[in-house]
Amino acid sequence: VLALIDMDIVCFRAASSAESEAFGIAKSRCQDMLDGILGKVKATEYRAFISSPSNFRKDVLPTYKANRTAVKPVHLQKLKDYAIKKMGAEMSPEGLEADDSLAIFQKEQGTIICTIDKDLLQVPGHHFSWEISGKGWKRPDLFLEQTELEGNRLFFEQCIKGDKADNVIGIKGLGDKKARNML
């Protein structure tokens, strides 16, 4: 099994968890998270992707992700650089996000997308989303086989309702429920 890893998220979560720690702690947590994912999906190999510094979506929609104003974790960029130099991560092609690279390579046989990003569920194939938790809630590991039909439905649903996480405005008056019912 070839695991396709969203290394942006792995690095972000590791850096966030080590905000007041030394960089070595962030590196260790990043490696532990990657090893945990690879073990759970029984990967024989992996490709991990980091988003390109440029993003074609911002050329199309200048407000794309403009709502993300929080300060980035202190070790994030250094951890991404480390992941590329020492952990075998790859920089996505110019203008593309890690998500795009995962979607492109998911077309190969024997792959599994490994991310907690809901947008990748638009891509047919095998998916793994690792356990996440917050104050008073927990979502367990999730393995999913996504169909092309359901992936397309999710894509069009998002086109209708928009995506608050990425600051993409949908059709006025059409939210989650109406978009879901339309499709």
What are these language model-derived features?
Residues A15-S16, V60-P62, V123-F128:
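Short acidic, glycine/serine/threonine-rich loops at helix termini
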Residues E21-F23, Y64-A66, K138:
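Generic alpha-helical propensity signal that fires on short helical segments
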Residues V1-R47, S51-D59:
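Non-catalytic, usually N-terminal nucleic-acid engagement modules in DNA/RNA processing proteins
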Residues F56-R68:
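Short beta-strand-loop
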